[in-house]
């Protein structure tokens, strides 16, 4: 029997407030959608925007590209929503984001990249982490893509984006999610970059050349005495 999702309260975020701008300005993000029968060049931009949204700029590697999904999207065999699902469930996304993090971190990253908003609170993070632990990643991804929030904001043909990151009449907007939530948490980053001692021989003390004792230095006589009669010095 699966555990039902926990209830959690919502918090105030910019994306929950409708904008009152008369005309779209620079504060509104560019919308990448297939509703208007895009050309070949526009389809390339849509695919690139999907990769950038899901994998972020620092994960856009050639190994992350799925040419089969791209071909299906170009020939209208799948929707943008299906393309997003294929990227999130791909082995590349799993290796780069899930295998090196815990469920809480993975939930936060998926909500930011799929729903285009930040998590409401720790209760929401815990609720979705339980779904991953009890029902798996695919059920969690289906829950996000089939939610009313995703359908109302992006539908089947629009690439997700960070909603209302920039608001009119403000000096600066919110931090982009790829900078706010990097791929690795500090705990995993510390473990990953911990130096390991691979030298199996004895560890010798290193003394720089300029600090070595010269002729006439009392330290040389002390070493000579230790070499001649160490037992006498220890007993005394």
UniProtKB/Swiss-Prot annotation:
Signal peptide: none annotated. One of its GO terms (biological process) is photosynthesis. Residues 11-193 form the PBS-linker domain. It is found in: Plastid, Chloroplast; Plastid, Chloroplast thylakoid membrane. PROSITE patterns: PBS_LINKER (PS51445). The keyword Plastid applies. It comes from the Eukaryota. It is a peripheral membrane protein. The keyword Chloroplast applies. Pfam families: PBS_linker_poly. Keywords: Antenna complex, Chloroplast, Membrane, Photosynthesis, Phycobilisome, Plastid, Thylakoid. Its main location: plastid. GO terms for cellular component: chloroplast thylakoid membrane; phycobilisome. PANTHER family: PHYCOBILISOME 32.1 KDA LINKER POLYPEPTIDE, PHYCOCYANIN-ASSOCIATED, ROD 2-RELATED. Belongs to the phycobilisome linker protein family. Rod-core linker protein required for attachment of phycocyanin to allophycocyanin in cores of phycobilisomes. Linker polypeptides determine the state of aggregation and the location of the disk-shaped phycobiliprotein units within the phycobilisome and modulate their spectroscopic properties in order to mediate a directed and optimal energy transfer. This is Phycobilisome rod-core linker polypeptide cpcG. It comes from Aglaothamnion neglectum. The lineage of its organism: Eukaryota, Rhodophyta, Florideophyceae, Rhodymeniophycidae, Ceramiales.
